[in-house]
């Protein structure tokens, strides 16, 4: 939650300096800078569960994600972040105070943990992905058609009968459940190409699990967008994924490269972090 983190860091510094915080001490609300690609009239919700550490199979994290479907683009993002952006822009238009925004975001936000918003150009079959971290980056890739194998088996998800399919993508083997009753060849993240909407998909090791938990046809179009960030690195997909691997292996160097100061007593360094992305390669 980018803006929330900014406000909380500001609050922390103000508290340390003066022990008193007033709404006027906070930075003013500014609109979220974004690039809008399309407008969506369909929103599909997916619960996202994943294991941050592949060696700790008992520890899970959970987020609510959404897929937005437009005529020319689809988008996929963390729902808590989208709600925070909407609150920010609404409070900016209404000229409300920064303190009111902080309170509203703290009340409304969920556990936003999906950090790679993306858009897909349907006609060109290209995806632009943004990855947040110590250093934010963005890459654009041509999407190769997934080699789906339609398999025997069926199940019911949200009261809808679904069929089974399998594929290999990003160095993992995946099992998906899709419904031809919803004739949209889309799914969460970059999964697409089946003869119906994907209702659930997970890798065979159950490190990443997406399960549909809602579909809404919107009365008012919703923008499909990514963030404008002048400090964001534009990289190739290969270099972007390499950078995130290196950031997990040596988070202190990543912080120093981002311009953030790190001070430790003695010679201790930040420990490496577990790395278990959706795509391994």
Model-derived regions: residue spans:
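Extended soluble regions of mature proteins
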Residues: 20-281
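Bacterial Sec-dependent N-terminal signal peptides
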Residues: 1-30
